[in-house]
Design a protein with these regions (language model features):
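Aromatic- and carboxylate-lined catalytic core of secreted/periplasmic carbohydrate-active enzymes
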Residues: 131-166
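Active-site His/acidic residue clusters
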Residues: 121-130
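Conserved alpha/beta catalytic core and glycan-binding cleft of carbohydrate-active enzymes
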Residues: 1-122, 152-177
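Short, contiguous acidic/charged loop-to-helix segments that flank catalytic cores in large enzymes
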Residues: 82-89, 130-138
Length: 177
């Protein structure tokens, strides 16, 4: 985890880099979680929060991380960051995870996020596995399974995700559609 703009974290040592394989994309994580917290009505005015990371996505070899740091210390679980009630919260979470899978960079979800753990994570207790008896949590788990299977099957989603050649904007500024 490196949270500054230190250059060449994943650059070759021979070229002055640090030689790490991947760097956590902290900027993407912050913008993504803040955007997803917004009521959908207000998202169009904050569209840049979802597109800005692509302006630097290939400056390092990034991994998109929704880590334990985002679901502890009164920051809420991912599902409880979502606006709305009931169905809307789960629909927002599904949309967010789909966006993440389509974004350049490797992916990492922290435990419990794949079935919408309700409580914040704590090292003092296990995950709330009983939630998988509830249809909405089963649906999130199935959604994640299907997204991951699609990601694995569709090489275009990962094959060139560390190169500009693997991405093309259709319209980065179409916030009002």
């Amino acid at each position: 985890e490196e949270s500054t703009a230190w250059p060449k974290v994943t650059g070759d040592v021979e070229d002055g880099g640090l030689g790490f394989s991947l760097k956590w994309n902290m900027g993407w994580m912050h913008d993504f979680t803040e955007y997803m917290k917004l009521d959908p009505y207000f998202r169009k005015d904050n569209h840049h929060m979802m597109t800005f990371a692509m302006s630097y996505a290939y400056s390092e070899d990034y991994i998109l991380v929704l880590s334990h740091d985002e679901v502890v210390h009164l920051k809420c679980s991912m599902i409880n960051k979502m606006p709305g009630l009931g169905f809307d919260k789960y629909a927002n979470l599904k949309a967010g995870y789909a966006f993440m899978m389509g974004h350049a960079g490797k992916k990492l979800l922290f435990m419990g996020q794949d079935f919408a753990q309700l409580r914040e994570w704590s090292e003092e207790r296990e995950l709330d596995w009983y939630l998988l008896e509830e249809p909405e949590h089963q649906a999130i788990q199935s959604w994640m399974r299907d997204l991951l299977h699609m990601y694995k099957k569709k090489q275009a989603l990962y094959e060139l995700d560390q190169s500009w050649e693997g991405f093309e904007w259709v319209n980065a500024d179409d916030a009002y559609r």
